[in-house]
Each structure stands twice: as C-alpha cells, then as structure tokens.
Amino acid sequence: MKLTIATRGSKLALWQSNHIKAQLESFGYEVELKIFKTKGDKILDTPLALIGGKGLFTKELEDAMLRGEADLAVHSLKDVPTELPEGLVLGAITKREMTNDSLLSEQYETLADLPPNAVVGTTSLRRRMQLLHLRPDICIKDLRGNVDTRINKLKNGEFDAIILAYAGLKRLGILESVRYVHPIDENTMIPAMGQAALGIECRPDVVDVVKKLNDEKSAIETFIERDFIDRLQGGCQVPIGVRASLLENNDIIVKAVIGLPDGSELLKDKIFGSKENYHELGKELAESMIDNGAKELLQRAEAMAFKEHK
C-alpha cells in the first residue's frame, strides 16, 4: 500500500513528516511526501491574530486530502482547529515531547534576568499575555518566520530574547545553537492546546493505518485540551493556554489561563479528575471559567489585539 503525506515545506514540518514517514515505513508501507504552502506560510508581514480565520497552517493540506492528492497530513497539533472539514478525521496523536515554552537569549538566562525594557520576540498572544503579566516592564515585538529566521533575528541583535516551543528546538537538534535556552515552568507559562504533539489528519479510508501511530496518554491529554478550547470557541490565535497532565497513577490535572494581550488581566483555573472521567474534564473546566467571565474576557482580548495592531 502506497501512502502520500501532505506537508508544509518548513524544516520543522519536514522533520515531523519524515518522522511519521519512517514509522509508517517500519510497518511495511511505501510512503512519499508532497509539499504544499499554506496561507500562514505565505503571509509573513502580518501578526497571525490579524490574518483571521482558522486553519492558517492546515487548510491547503486538508484540501489536498479531500481532492485525493494525499492520504494524510502531519500537523503540529496546536495548529489544528477543533472542527475538522467533513470527510477528514484526526486519526492519531503522537507521543508528546516536553510541552514547555522556552526563553532563548544570547545574554540572559531566565525571564527574571531580563532588564527593564528588554525586547522579547513572539507573535503568540498567549505567550505575550503571560509574559507581560509577569514582567510588565518588558517590550514585546512580533516575531514571524521559521525557526531559523527567528533565531537569526535574535543573533543579529533585533531582540534581547525570543520565545519558542521547546519541542520544535529539540526535534530540529538546535538546542545548542543559542547560548541560553531556558524551559519556562508551566505554572509561569501555560502551553497552547496540543503543544508538542503531532496530529495526524487523514481520510477515513486510511484511519486503520494511521491509528497505529497513536499514543494513548497524549491522545487523552490533548482530547481534554481541544474539548476545552472548543467549548470556549477559541481559535489558535486567541490568548488561551491549557495543559492537561495524565499522571502515572491515572489522576489528571488540567490547568488553563485566559486574559488580555497586555497581561493586565488574567483568569486562571484548574481541575482534578481521573482517566476514567477524562471525557468530562475539558467541559467542566470551560464551564467553570465561563461562569467566572471567560467569554467576556476573550471578547475584550480580541478587541484589544486588533486595536493594538491597527
């Protein structure tokens, strides 16, 4: 059986797709990659929150599958909207890497070491919100482009520090390319939904093949996170962090944060449960936060994000 994987063309996307290709080949399948450019890849001069719409890094890959040009697509799960197009399913979630965000700098080892007015690069409203809440004295500037481009901007002195996901740095083997790479504690910066996991989207006719790649622990954790986001109706470009952790004793902790992009107002909550009732946890946490004003806070956050970039 021959399979075609739809992928973006960035170094990280190709690493991820080749990683899945190798696993499928170990099961005896013949696999090829087909590269597509997404809307998010083409528009590099505009903050993601202003581009609008969901599926900025997935739609073109999904269209290829629906046309029959590809059988599956490998995504960074955090980029995958909670609602998929009709005719496609999320067939597998791979084992997660460490989910932390990381501070990268040539001069400063930790967030606490950054001087007042330090320039920190990130386009993520979620990271911006949590950074400014902790350090309202620093300056956040937008940072777009692939991982290499972002690191080059840091090394060229455009930024005192930048924030990237630890998982991508590890997968690309570039943890040593910057003097300081400091994973930020998840209680300080809650990750994005699905961060550090790969989501394999596919047509239903190949789901039996794809599900061989599924990691149960990661699938449970990310189900909770995606359900939480879905119930809040929050896309990939709103300031929401959520992290579900399935522990060795089958207990589950889910923590989340919502707030304004300038960090002036944050709403945090957490819930405890077990593997047996994991289907309910995302819903319960979302409803608890909605009762405490989450919907209104998200509306204000969206308005603030658009106003700041006008």
From Swiss-Prot:
Cofactor descriptive note: Binds 1 dipyrromethane group covalently.
Name of the gene encoding the protein in the UniProt record: hemC
The name this protein goes by in its record: Porphobilinogen deaminase
HAMAP family in alphabetical order: Porphobil_deam (MF_00260)
GO biological process: protoporphyrinogen IX biosynthetic process
Stored PANTHER family: PORPHOBILINOGEN DEAMINASE (PTHR11557:SF0)
SUPFAM superfamilies, A to Z: Periplasmic binding protein-like II, Porphobilinogen deaminase (hydroxymethylbilane synthase), C-terminal domain
GO cellular component, one term: cytoplasm
GO molecular function: hydroxymethylbilane synthase activity
